[in-house]
Curated annotation (Swiss-Prot):
CDD domains: Ribosomal_S15p_S13e. The gene is rpsO. It comes from the Bacteria. Keywords: Ribonucleoprotein, Ribosomal protein, RNA-binding, rRNA-binding. HAMAP family: Ribosomal_uS15_B (MF_01343_B). Part of the 30S ribosomal subunit. Forms a bridge to the 50S subunit in the 70S ribosome, contacting the 23S rRNA. It holds the Pfam family Ribosomal_S15. One of its GO terms (molecular function) is rRNA binding. This is Small ribosomal subunit protein uS15. Belongs to the universal ribosomal protein uS15 family. One of the primary rRNA binding proteins, it binds directly to 16S rRNA where it helps nucleate assembly of the platform of the 30S subunit by binding and bridging several RNA helices of the 16S rRNA. InterPro entries: Ribosomal_uS15, Ribosomal_uS15_bac-type, uS15_NS1_RNA-bd_sf.
Amino acid sequence: MAISQEKKNEIMKKYARHEGDTGSAEVQIAVLTADINELNDHIKAHKKDYASYRGLMKKIGHRRNLLAYLRNTDVQRYRELVKSLGLRR
């Protein structure tokens, strides 16, 4: 269900602000988005997997908080990230 380490590393390279950046808001949001998409596919196939559904809701809430933080601190970076990830905002 969780994304592979290779895929996570690719995402980190793409959205990193500098070399070795693994914790910036952009990287965290991008990794969470990939996780959310994977979990969403799993939930569609396994509708009664309520534990995974709860994990999905927690990840969505965490991403929402990070997006709000990024929007409040740097609107331009927020808009670029939302556009590149294809989030509806």
